[in-house]
């Protein structure tokens, strides 16, 4: 956890521990490598505020990309999803490259884009379980995810 990614649900961390995971915390702002890990979890936060620093940490960006090519599970929520995208475009128009693991660009807006509770149902089997699982969550964001139409993303849930 660090200043860029610090919104984590305690229940999620507890469930990971109950499943046998040893949680290792790190900072995408300052760490250049990770210890041996079997998966990555990026919580919410304010990556847009720290976009220049996150974008400059090339050694960690490359290291995480290499891990993704080895097909380790990577889970991200909100700001973490922005970090997985091609990059973050700030309100002022400045663009900062990120991991590029998702064919989309995170675009910051001046006005609130979403606030409230959501419920989704899985359409495919995922690391969380079988088809038809229902999840509840909430949204609070000033960003949109602009999908790259030339490389579409298959969503594994429906709202």
Where are these regions (language model features)?
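Structural beta-strand/beta-sheet cores of well-ordered domains, especially the beta-sheet scaffolds
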Residues: 19-21, 38, 70, 97, ...
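Structured core elements
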Residues: 24-25, 41, 76, 83, ...
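A short secondary-structure junction signal
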Residues: 9-11, 87, 132, 151
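Generic secondary-structure signature for well-ordered alpha-helical cores
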Residues: 18-22, 69, 104-107, 145
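G-domain G4 guanine-recognition motif of GTPases
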Residues: 1-4, 141-142
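Phosphate-binding active sites in nucleotide-utilizing proteins
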Residues: 5-57, 61-67
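Cysteine-nucleophile active-site neighborhood
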Residues: 47-126
């Amino acid at each position: 956890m660090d200043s860029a990614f610090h919104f984590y649900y305690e229940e999620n961390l507890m469930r990971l521990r109950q499943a046998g995971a040893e949680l290792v915390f790190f900072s995408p702002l300052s760490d250049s490598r990770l210890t041996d890990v079997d998966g990555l979890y990026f919580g919410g936060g304010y990556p847009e505020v720290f976009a220049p620093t996150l974008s400059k940490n090339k050694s960690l960006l490359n290291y995480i990309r290499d891990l993704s090519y080895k097909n380790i599970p990577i889970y991200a929520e909100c700001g973490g999803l922005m970090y997985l995208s091609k990059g973050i475009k700030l309100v002022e128009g400045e663009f900062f490259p990120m991991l590029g693991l998702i064919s989309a660009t995170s675009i910051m807006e001046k006005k609130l884009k979403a606030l409230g509770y959501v419920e989704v149902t899985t359409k495919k089997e995922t690391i969380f379980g079988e088809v038809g699982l229902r999840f509840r969550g909430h949204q609070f964001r000033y960003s949109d995810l602009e999908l790259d139409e030339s490389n579409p993303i298959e969503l594994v849930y429906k709202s």
